[in-house]
């Protein structure tokens, strides 16, 4: 594997000059007003340069960006994809674990047969992993004329947008990026299993039926998908409390970007966001403890959105 580049080397400086205008335009489109130059020069560009230096091969590299809700994984992925396209002339496509949720009807069925909390999207067991594998398989084996549909999910509506509005990707990419809050996660081991750890679990899942079901689901088809990653990048945030605040900030940002009044009504308030994140807390805490030891790249993010590399290849 190639050596990870120094952000000050000539290749990185040249790559930034070639992509700077496009990167700042994307930041504006994403409603990110306070992005720093150093985020691009010290994080996005070295990552882009590293991915571009990987050995050429016939099938795409499959790269996962993982991190808690609101950690910035989707945004970082979008910037890297853009820099690869503009600065390196590489073809890339990205999709998210949020794009492959099971339908509300499927989750309602799980809620009736297993536990009421199963109807809430997010935890392992609420995704259509087969759909994710089908997308990956189509992209990996694509011919020049192959069209791969990339699903799109509406968080305010809690269901997929109509299929006719899904993105079409033509041909085979050089890179496939997948962002997932639990990407690469391993099931919580028996010895690390803890009793109910927040209000939601204490009040609605005191016997651990739902949390153990989700952990069992994670041990299944999710691992088949995760084993296909060529590289796993983790964004490590300071603590679980930071995840709560970051997800609330994400909801506020979403509210600013929505134009449809009916969609705006679906935006969660702070109390609703915090309750929502409680569904993820058990596995998120385990990921924060365990994943830095086996992720290929670890990017640390502090409380004021400063990023730095903690681990590189």
Set out the residue ranges of the language-model regions.
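Conserved nucleotide-sensing/catalytic segment adjacent to the nucleotide-binding pocket
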Residues: 35, 93-96, 100-158
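Post-Walker A helix-loop "phosphate-sensing" segment adjacent to the P-loop in P-loop NTPases
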Residues: 82-93
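Loop/turn-to-beta-strand initiation segments
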Residues: 145-146, 172-176, 231
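Conserved lysine of the Walker
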Residues: 73
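Extreme N-terminal, non-catalytic leader segments
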Residues: 1-64, 68
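Switch II (G3) loop of P-loop NTPases
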Residues: 176-182
């Amino acid at each position: 594997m190639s050596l990870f580049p120094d952000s000050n080397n000539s290749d990185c400086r040249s790559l930034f000059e070639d992509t700077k205008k496009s990167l700042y335009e994307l930041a504006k489109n994403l409603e990110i007003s306070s992005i720093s130059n150093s985020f691009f020069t010290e994080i996005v560009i070295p990552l882009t340069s590293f991915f571009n230096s990987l050995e050429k091969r016939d099938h795409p590299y499959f790269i996962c960006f993982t991190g808690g809700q609101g950690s910035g994984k989707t945004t970082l992925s979008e910037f890297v994809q853009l820099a690869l396209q503009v600065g390196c002339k590489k073809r890339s496509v990205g999709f998210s674990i949020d794009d492959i949720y099971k339908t509300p009807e499927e989750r309602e069925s799980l809620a009736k047969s297993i536990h009421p909390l199963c109807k809430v999207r997010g935890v392992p067991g609420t995704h259509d992993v087969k759909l994710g594998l089908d997308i990956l398989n189509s992209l990996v084996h694509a011919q020049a004329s192959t069209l791969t549909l990339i699903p799109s999910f509406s968080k305010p509506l809690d269901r997929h947008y109509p299929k006719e509005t899904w993105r079409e990707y033509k041909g085979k990419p050089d890179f496939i990026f997948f962002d997932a809050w639990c990407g690469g996660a391993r099931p919580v081991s028996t010895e690390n299993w803890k009793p109910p750890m927040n209000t939601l679990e204490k009040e609605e899942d005191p016997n651990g039926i739902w949390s153990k079901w989700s952990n069992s689901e994670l041990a299944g088809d999710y691992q088949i998908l995760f084993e296909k990653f060529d590289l796993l990048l983790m964004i490590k945030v300071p603590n679980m409390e930071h995840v709560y605040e970051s997800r609330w900030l994400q909801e506020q940002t979403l509210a600013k970007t929505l134009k449809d009044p009916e969609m705006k009504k679906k935006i969660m308030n702070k109390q609703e966001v915090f309750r929502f994140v409680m569904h993820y807390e058990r596995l998120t805490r385990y990921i924060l403890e365990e994943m830095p030891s086996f992720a290929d790249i670890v990017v640390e993010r502090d409380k004021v959105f400063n990023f730095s590399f903690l681990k590189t290849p």
